[in-house]
């Protein structure tokens, strides 16, 4: 398993912020599919998915903007700081399942 630092931009009521997550997956395809699943399910009522990298909701807009494979030491440092949410991806790229370090499903936390 490898860990990526994934970045998303979130616009909410005219304010844009960057959100980063640590994504642990078997390969880049699985990691990217997990980020796309996060974007699709950020809030409950998806209005529009644009090019599989931008999602529009009544509450705001989410963009997938970066993914970087981390070296082991980088992963260790970022996890040690404890300020980023860490997700482990299982399942197939067309149906990824994301769980945090306590076993909570992404869909249960965001809804």
Where are each of the predicted segments found?
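Short aromatic-glycine-(Arg/Gly/Cys) micro-motifs in beta-strand/loop hairpins
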Residues: 1-19
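Conserved short hydrophobic patches within well-ordered secondary structure
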Residues: 8, 22-24, 64
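A short, exposed loop/beta-hairpin motif centered on an aromatic-Gly-Thr core
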Residues: 16-28
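Short amphipathic alpha-helices within nucleic acid-binding modules
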Residues: 29-34
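Short, mixed-charge low-complexity intrinsically disordered segments
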Residues: 37-111
């Amino acid at each position: 398993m490898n860990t990526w630092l994934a970045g998303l931009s979130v616009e909410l009521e005219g304010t844009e912020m960057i959100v980063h997550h640590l994504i642990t997956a078997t390969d880049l395809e699985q990691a990217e599919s997990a980020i796309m699943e996060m974007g699709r399910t950020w809030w409950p009522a998806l209005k529009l998915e644009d090019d599989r990298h931008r999602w529009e909701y009544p509450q705001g807009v989410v963009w997938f903007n970066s993914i970087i494979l981390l070296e082991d030491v980088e992963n260790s440092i970022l996890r040690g700081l404890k300020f980023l949410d860490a997700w482990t991806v299982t399942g197939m790229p067309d149906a990824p399942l994301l769980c945090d370090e306590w076993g909570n499903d992404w869909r249960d936390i965001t809804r």
